[in-house]
């Protein structure tokens, strides 16, 4: 197989595996309930509470306390949400990791078209993490017959940048 054929091979075409939307509140109670409501309205999906991994006395957090909410989006839901979220953020190369994942924050949830400011709730920010992979990545995650991904098939920050620029019409800055 020549160099140009391998570059356009269907197993080398990256795709959006998932988008994780996360809101860290740092405490339970009413602020956490408000965050759940906001994230469910923005994503149209049921949220899951996240718990603290360790006790931090300075913040009054005990291990196992609910301190945030998250939603995982896949398929068309992920594409639709990412289209909206990318318009609200300036993306730079430093927001990509070595394996092609992208993380960015949205400082104000009211920037989303479906949201309006409510003085009873206030303003919440949220984190968005995208996972961009190539077909065949499951072999490194499955339980049986796990295998490593060859270096030439792994995603890089440059591959992920090119994927976002072509599929989501985003300009990635230095």
Curated annotation (Swiss-Prot):
Keyword Ribosomal protein: yes
Biological process terms in GO annotation: translation
GO molecular function, one term: rRNA binding
Signal peptide stretch: none
Pfam family, one: Ribosomal_L5_C
Disulfide bonds: none
Entry GO terms, CC: ribonucleoprotein complex; ribosome
Keyword check for RNA-binding: yes
Keyword annotations of the record: Ribonucleoprotein, Ribosomal protein, RNA-binding, rRNA-binding, tRNA-binding
Cross-referenced InterPro entries: Ribosomal_uL5, Ribosomal_uL5_arc, Ribosomal_uL5_C, Ribosomal_uL5_dom_sf, Ribosomal_uL5_N
Task of the protein: This is one of the proteins that bind and probably mediate the attachment of the 5S RNA into the large ribosomal subunit, where it forms part of the central protuberance. In the 70S ribosome it contacts protein S13 of the 30S subunit (bridge B1b), connecting the 2 subunits; this bridge is implicated in subunit movement. May contact the P site tRNA; the 5S rRNA and some of its associated proteins might help stabilize positioning of ribosome-bound tRNAs.
Oligomer status and interactors: Part of the 50S ribosomal subunit; contacts the 5S rRNA and probably tRNA. Forms a bridge to the 30S subunit in the 70S ribosome.
Family per similarity comment: Belongs to the universal ribosomal protein uL5 family.
Protein name according to UniProt: Large ribosomal subunit protein uL5
Organism, as annotated: Halorubrum lacusprofundi (strain ATCC 49239 / DSM 5036 / JCM 8891 / ACAM 34)
Gene name for this UniProt entry: rpl5
């Amino acid at each position: 197989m020549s160099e140009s054929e391998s570059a356009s091979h269907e197993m080398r075409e990256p795709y959006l595996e998932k988008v994780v939307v996360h809101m860290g509140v740092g405490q339970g109670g009413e602020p956490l309930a408000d965050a759940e409501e906001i994230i469910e309205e923005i994503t149209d999906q049921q949220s899951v509470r996240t718990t603290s991994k360790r006790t931090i006395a300075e913040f009054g957090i005990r291990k196992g306390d609910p301190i945030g909410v998250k939603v995982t989006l896949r398929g068309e839901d992920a594409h639709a949400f990412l289209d909206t979220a990318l318009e609200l953020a300036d993306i730079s190369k430093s927001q990509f990791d070595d394996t092609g994942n992208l993380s960015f924050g949205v400082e104000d949830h009211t920037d989303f078209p479906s949201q309006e400011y409510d003085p009873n709730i206030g303003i919440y920010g949220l984190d968005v993490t995208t996972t961009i992979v190539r077909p065949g990545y499951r072999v490194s995650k499955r339980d049986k017959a796990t295998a490593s991904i060859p270096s030439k098939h792994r995603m890089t920050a440059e591959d992920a940048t090119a994927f976002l620029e072509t599929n989501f019409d985003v300009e990635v800055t230095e």
